[in-house]
Amino acid sequence: MNIQAILSEKVSQALIAAGAPADSEAHIRQSAKAQFGDYQANGVMAAAKKVGMPPRQLAEKVVNLLNLQGIASKVEIAGPGFINIFLDKAWIAANIETALKDEKLGVTPAKPQTIVVDYSAPNVAKQMHVGHLRSTIIGDAAVRTLEFLGHKVIRANHVGDWGTQFGMLIAYLEKVQNENASDMALSDLEAFYREAKKHYDEDEEFAIRARGYVVKLQGGDEYCRTMWRKLVDITMAQNQQTYDRLNVTLTKDSVMGESLYNDLLPSIVADLKQQGLAVESDGATVVYLDEYKNKEGEPMGVIIQKQDGGYLYTTTDIACAKYRYETLHADRILYYIDSRQHQHLMQAWTIVRKAGYVPESVSLEHHMFGMMLGKDSKPFKTRAGGTVRLTDLLDEAIERANTLIREKNPDMPEDELKKVVSAVGIGAVKYADLSKSRTTDYIFDWDNMLAFEGNTAPYMQYAYTRVASIFKRAEIDESSLTLPVILNEDREQTLATRLLQFEETITTVAREGTPHVMCAYLYDLAGLFSCFYEHCQILNAESEELRQSRLKLALLTAKTLKQGLNTLGIETVERM
């Protein structure tokens, strides 16, 4: 149930009935302070301006026409024309009951769409590094959220599995006569990559041979294809181990690398020429875009085919968007790629729209993100200044969590300890990232992310175990809770109202790709429960009716925390 949507519809109807234009919006917001009610309608001022009426006068007309019977106990006008809405206790209680009986916690399924989510995108023959973390975990949180709401989600891991580097690798592997590539570890491949690059830069004969292998590979040469496939398979097998450790839902079936679009590129270039969008310029094929200007103020030229016949990332991205609409039948396409790629993507999509490959009805969205920084506010590096491998980062997270949990639970059985350490260590790394707005850079800090205070994974995981332990300790089965929810105390009502705002939260995350909104909601919910727990007796409540009612609030809190963390890919544990 989406309270915001319900109130928005009701207030908008009243606004229009009061004489406001048909496109008037209620602008319903959760109230910042209890004195302003549970929700506030802020749309009257804008509507009043359009109809030339004093805002307060329009607000009075709206309130008189507003039918919130059974939903609100009180509606007030404040200031110049704000409408404060106080929800009815009985209505809140009834909806808590409904949410408890529903495996989706009262969340209304969305109208299903086919949504392609492009995320992670590591490169072949290279180990994943911290630069891949944000795309991987933010994208996966989006996928989990969209699937929870009932959408058909297609995971697209746009792996860098094509290009000049494969000519270099194949040429160098041949040079050292190591054709049995499948026996190599990925660390060996990285060493090969460095050596191949060195030879490519310093040995012109080697570079010519490498470029020749690229042509052969693109032409379908069997030997080159076999070597290429081995390199891809070794890389993705290693990456899958990282995905599994991260509790990320990507699999081998999610791989849709650059190579997938190779066969589409010639026809796309030909079609863009035929449509008059692309022209020849100094032997290359270029699309000039009026929307983007160069330094001279002239339309910017976007190259889609080089003089030597080679294609560029833009060409692949055009083909990629076309494929996702025409073949995958996407209604919405989300890209979790860092902010530095924004102009590149916008140019590719401008061409896609002009060519008619993807209609305006299909949303193309770049959910960009900032960088992960060290405490010095510079890009996160090793002490030696090198790139931090993702496996090394996760190893350190486990090591630090192990020390932390052992100190708190010296007698915990080893098998249980291992599960808790993994959940806390990996969860801490993920939550530290997901709890920050994805559009900004953030500081990576071990001490903060592993703290049991503040908006951290350990705090949230502990908050869940604390609530769940109430039922475990008292050996209470939820089926025994047969009495209705009653809300006598303010803290009970505040907690109950916040619980009912889960759908508003998850809908926002799905619409905007902002998992930090879910983190903020869960953190606030945990704080409200803590306040409720300290001031309202649960197991020793003064009556059985009150005891069961408060247990129901605790139960829905536990379920909401668990489900919310699950949409973020954060595991919960029963004991910490």
Swiss-Prot record:
InterPro entries: aa-tRNA-synth_I_CS, Arg-tRNA-ligase, Arg-tRNA-synth_N, Arg-tRNA-synth_N_sf, ArgRS_core, DALR_anticod-bd, Rossmann-like_a/b/a_fold, tRNAsynth_Ia_anticodon-bd. The keyword Iron does not apply. GO terms for biological process: arginyl-tRNA aminoacylation. One of its GO terms (cellular component) is cytoplasm. It comes from the Bacteria. Pfam families: Arg_tRNA_synt_N (PF03485), DALR_1 (PF05746), tRNA-synt_1d (PF00750). PROSITE patterns: AA_TRNA_LIGASE_I. The keyword Zinc does not apply. It is found in: Cytoplasm. CDD domains: Anticodon_Ia_Arg, ArgRS_core. One of its GO terms (molecular function) is ATP binding. Its EC number is 6.1.1.19. A motif ('HIGH' region) lies at residues 122-132. Its main location: cytoplasm. SMART domains: Arg_tRNA_synt_N (SM01016), DALR_1 (SM00836). It catalyses: tRNA(Arg) + L-arginine + ATP = L-arginyl-tRNA(Arg) + AMP + diphosphate. Belongs to the class-I aminoacyl-tRNA synthetase family. Monomer. This is Arginine--tRNA ligase.
